[in-house]
Amino acid sequence: MAIYLDFENHIKEIQNEIELALIRGDEDAKEILEKRLDKEVKSIYSNLTDFQKLQLARHPDRPYAMDYIDLILKDKYEVFGDRHYNDDKAIVCFIGKIDNVPVVVIGEEKGRGTKNKLLRNFGMPNPCGYRKALKMAKFAEKFNLPILMLVDTAGAYPGIGAEERGQSEAIAKNLQEFASLKVPTISVIIGEGGSGGALAIAVADKLAMMEYSIFSVISPEGCAAILWDDPSKTEVAIKAMKITPRDLKEAGLIDDIILEPSKGAHRDKFSAANTIKEYFLDALRTIQQDPHFLDNRYQKLMSLGSFVESMN
């Protein structure tokens, strides 16, 4: 059963009317209602607030990494473990083909249903997850395979065990190693891009965001709690943080925005998956045609800013 957000109530009402028209066999009414539905969808989705975009990024029906992997990756083989400690189910790694192009895919998976969400730790990776991702990145480099990364996490897992096993070191190591990989890397934020948990698999030649995704250093709720000690300030925090694709593109922090189906990826995962596939193939061609893509990646990362230590 489809889940509708509060601002989608009119869409839900029209959709219910369409279903009743189908039951009655009234094709004329169905056609009129479908046109009305298209008009309502365009009206609502062309005037979304940043808070509503946040709601869409977290929509329960939004496609997750495994949904996209199942739809676009053929002849796939999943790889497990980090060769150090454990296999983190919040990070999934596959070898396969996208339109006959051999590729390594790394994704953050939130899981569906209570049992699967617990298995996936709600998409919050432990250090072994990031080390698993790095293992696969090095595999891709060894066999000259491009890498597609699908980012979707509220953040790295903040538990005591994760910190004891070197959460910050694992993330920092990924930032360092992914920056110098000698193969094309393409990262797409498909839902939530939360803090270092997202950055750990977001250093790439091309960094794109789905139209209704977010990318932030902290959750808006966390920001509101820290700055104002008031959860009701979440919408104010969202505007101040500039977490939407449009804001981040204007700031030069991402390369591209991938448009979603008119009703959002959560209403048409097949079209959304195809759009990601086409973006990956186009971006890959562009990178492969550039003999200086490694230098360009370095310059792009350096243009984001630098950290300087002083003894004074």
UniProtKB/Swiss-Prot annotation:
It is an enzyme of class 2 (transferase). The keyword ATP-binding applies. The keyword Transcription regulation does not apply. Its EC number is 2.1.3.15. It catalyses: N(6)-carboxybiotinyl-L-lysyl-[protein] + acetyl-CoA = N(6)-biotinyl-L-lysyl-[protein] + malonyl-CoA. Residues 36-286 form the CoA carboxyltransferase C-terminal domain. Its main location: cytoplasm. Pathway: Lipid metabolism; malonyl-CoA biosynthesis; malonyl-CoA from acetyl-CoA: step 1/1. Pfam families: ACCA. Gene3D superfamilies: 2-enoyl-CoA Hydratase, Chain A, domain 1 (3.90.226.10). Belongs to the AccA family. Acetyl-CoA carboxylase is a heterohexamer composed of biotin carboxyl carrier protein (AccB), biotin carboxylase (AccC) and two subunits each of ACCase subunit alpha (AccA) and ACCase subunit beta (AccD). Component of the acetyl coenzyme A carboxylase (ACC) complex. First, biotin carboxylase catalyzes the carboxylation of biotin on its carrier protein (BCCP) and then the CO(2) group is transferred by the carboxyltransferase to acetyl-CoA to form malonyl-CoA. NCBIfam families: accA, AccA_sub, PRK05724.1. This is Acetyl-coenzyme A carboxylase carboxyl transferase subunit alpha. The gene is accA.
